[in-house]
């Protein structure tokens, strides 16, 4: 397995190569094949640490950094002399403390979107010469955002939200546009974001008080009509939206008392999600099965209040403590890392822990580059020696056969 993780303490990253069964907390267990520092350029500083990773066409590794830098690295093979060579560094005009909330690929445009907390959004066309000037998309409203997502079914559609900024869906450009648009002289005119949906808040609580809004994550789900979305909040809620049914959430569930940090689909059917919070929760929930009386709270005025929640399918346990910020589900595995400085890799279906590696740094982002086990150098040398011995044996047999023939 090969995973790259951000190193928040230094502003660089680490490449971890390990196999199933790796556990650095046990002296007699399998140890990582390698843990190498990388992405040291353009500068290694906590003030420009990497917040998001993206693999672009399996050709480039892109990192969105605090303060507006977007670094593009070469995704080279293991035998390359210089791994993750810096190819280009875009510098976006944002404040030094402005944090990227999303780094997304727009396949139909051969481009990426970078969204910041300040509500600034940039479109960058990725070509071989990296000579495209980032285009700032002027949003209809400028409110701070905490979440930004693209619709995989229609990449001209995005959704955003944040603190007291309820869910909005926007159209960034016409659906018929593709990457040839950048050949036009005034291509900027093709990108005029428009709000096409504004959500309404849930009804007041049992005390008739307004429920506060603070969206932390957004996922687009598959939809035959309109748009379906899943959101998480700073108040531990999971909400399901269907624009074909109205502006309010179709379902509103409380799954934790802590702020939800990440939200990830756990299967291709999009019927399961993985949630992490600021404490130690890493859990898988069903979106189709509901426990009607799973969440209980006591109110001085209303007594015991019972609410339904998505069925808990199980937790990913491996001694994790503190918030988990880096999450990536890929093929059969899922990887986690965060404040406790450990990388943990699990089987996505069974939740069995496959690898546990101490990193020595806090992590904001990670990306699985390969989910298969990797041979270490000793194994490679042994196999090469066996192949050479086999070849020598066949050569000897071939020589004897020719001698007998003569």
Curated annotation (Swiss-Prot):
Source domain of life: Eukaryota
InterPro entries, per the entry: WD40/YVTN_repeat-like_dom_sf, WD40_repeat_dom_sf, WDR74/Nsa1
Subcellular localization, as worded in the UniProt entry: Nucleus, Nucleolus
Annotated region described as Disordered, given as residue ranges: 373-406
Keyword annotations: Nucleus, Ribosome biogenesis, rRNA processing
Example GO biological process: ribosomal large subunit biogenesis
Primary role: Involved in the biogenesis of the 60S ribosomal subunit.
Subunit structure: Component of the pre-66S ribosomal particle.
Family named by the database record: Belongs to the NSA1 family.
Identification of the protein by name: Ribosome biogenesis protein NSA1
Organism, as annotated: Candida albicans (strain SC5314 / ATCC MYA-2876) (Yeast)
């Amino acid at each position: 397995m090969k995973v790259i993780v951000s190193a928040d303490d230094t502003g660089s990253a680490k490449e971890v190569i390990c196999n199933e069964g790796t556990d650095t907390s046990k002296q007699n267990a399998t140890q990582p094949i390698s843990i190498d520092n990388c992405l040291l350029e353009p500068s290694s500083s906590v003030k420009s640490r990497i917040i998001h990773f993206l693999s672009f066409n399996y050709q480039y590794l892109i990192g969105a950094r605090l303060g507006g830098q977007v670094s593009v690295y070469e995704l080279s093979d293991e035998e390359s002399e210089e791994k993750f060579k810096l190819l280009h560094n875009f510098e976006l005009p944002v404040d030094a403390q402005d944090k990227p909330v999303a780094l997304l690929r727009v396949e139909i445009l051969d481009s990426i979107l970078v969204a910041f907390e300040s509500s600034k959004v940039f479109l960058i066309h990725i070509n071989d010469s990296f000579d495209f000037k980032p285009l700032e998309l002027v949003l209809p409203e400028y409110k701070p955002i905490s979440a930004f997502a693209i619709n995989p079914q229609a990449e001209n559609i995005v959704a955003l939200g944040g603190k007291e900024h309820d869910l909005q869906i926007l159209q960034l450009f016409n659906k018929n546009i593709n990457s040839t648009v950048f050949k036009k002289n005034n291509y900027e005119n093709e990108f005029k974001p428009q709000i096409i949906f504004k959500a309404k808040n849930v009804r007041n609580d049992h005390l008739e008080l307004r429920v506060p809004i603070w969206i932390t994550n957004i996922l687009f789900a598959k939809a035959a009509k309109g748009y379906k979305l899943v959101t998480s909040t700073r108040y531990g809620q999971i909400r399901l939206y269907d624009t074909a049914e109205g502006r309010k959430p179709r379902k509103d569930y409380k799954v934790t008392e802590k702020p939800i940090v990440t939200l990830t689909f756990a299967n291709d059917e999009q019927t399961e999600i993985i949630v992490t919070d600021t404490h130690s929760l890493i859990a898988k929930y069903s979106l189709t099965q509901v426990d009607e009386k799973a969440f209980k709270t006591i109110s001085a005025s209303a007594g015991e209040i019972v609410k339904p929640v998505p069925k808990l399918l199980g937790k990913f346990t491996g001694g994790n403590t503190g918030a988990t910020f880096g999450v990536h589900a890929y093929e059969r595995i899922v990887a986690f890392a965060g404040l406790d400085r450990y990388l943990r890799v699990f089987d996505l279906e069974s939740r069995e822990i496959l690898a546990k590696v101490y990193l020595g740094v806090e992590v904001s982002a990670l990306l699985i580059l390969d989910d298969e086990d990797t041979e270490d150098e000793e194994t490679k040398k042994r196999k090469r020696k066996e192949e050479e011995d086999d070849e020598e044996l066949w050569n000897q047999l071939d020589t004897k056969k020719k001698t007998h023939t003569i």
